[in-house]
Amino acid sequence: MSALDVPMKQIRNTPVVLGEADLLKTIQLLPGVQAGMEGFSGLHVRGGGPDQNLILLDGIPIYNADHLLGVFSIFTPEAMKKVTLFKGSFPARYGGRLSSIIDIRTNDGDMQNYHGTISVGLLTSKLHFEGPIIKNKTSFCLTGRRTYLDLVARPFLPEDKKYNYYFYDINAKVNHKF
């Protein structure tokens, strides 16, 4: 089985376009994976097309994994715990695709302490916060991101028209030990 765990540190430290760490662009740098077009997040694994990949987020299929025609992926690194890429000979439970499986597991949240980060980038801002609800029993993880493309584009658009050129992502998870 050709499974590869993608280290979270590698995702966060990969040189990026527009200052935003991106899971799919990091995967494009791995052997056997090619990008569709420069700067976009389409994946061609071992000759297959982007529609032949299965992307799972905690076991749930994701059919549209990017924003702005592939410039940004929907996955924020702070919300991810583990990423596994299967480039061939994947288990039968992942059936239905020809090229690859990207299995993403989200962060469970810290059972002991509260902590978080706020980051402001060239085109996006992010917030990540996690901690216990009930220590050693229940935790949460909350991550949000918003672009300000609408603010950047405003000076170039007619004054009588308002366009909403932006997107936002919110990932929330509550984890409880029974």
Predicted regions and their residues:
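Glycine/Thr-rich phosphate-binding loops of Rossmann-like dinucleotide-binding domains
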Residues: 93-94, 112
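Extracellular loop and loop/strand-boundary signature of outer-membrane beta-barrel proteins
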Residues: 67, 113-115, 156-161
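Transmembrane beta-barrel wall of Gram-negative outer-membrane proteins
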Residues: 121-146, 159-178
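Hydrophobic, lipid-facing positions within transmembrane beta-strands of outer-membrane proteins
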Residues: 23, 41, 98-100, 114-116, ...
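Hydrophobic alpha-helical membrane segments
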Residues: 90, 152-159
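Periplasmic N-terminal accessory/gating domains of Gram-negative outer-membrane beta-barrel systems
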Residues: 1-90, 101, 107-108
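Gram-negative outer-membrane beta-barrel proteins
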Residues: 110, 126, 148-154
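Outer-envelope beta-barrel architecture signal
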Residues: 53, 79, 112-116, 134-140
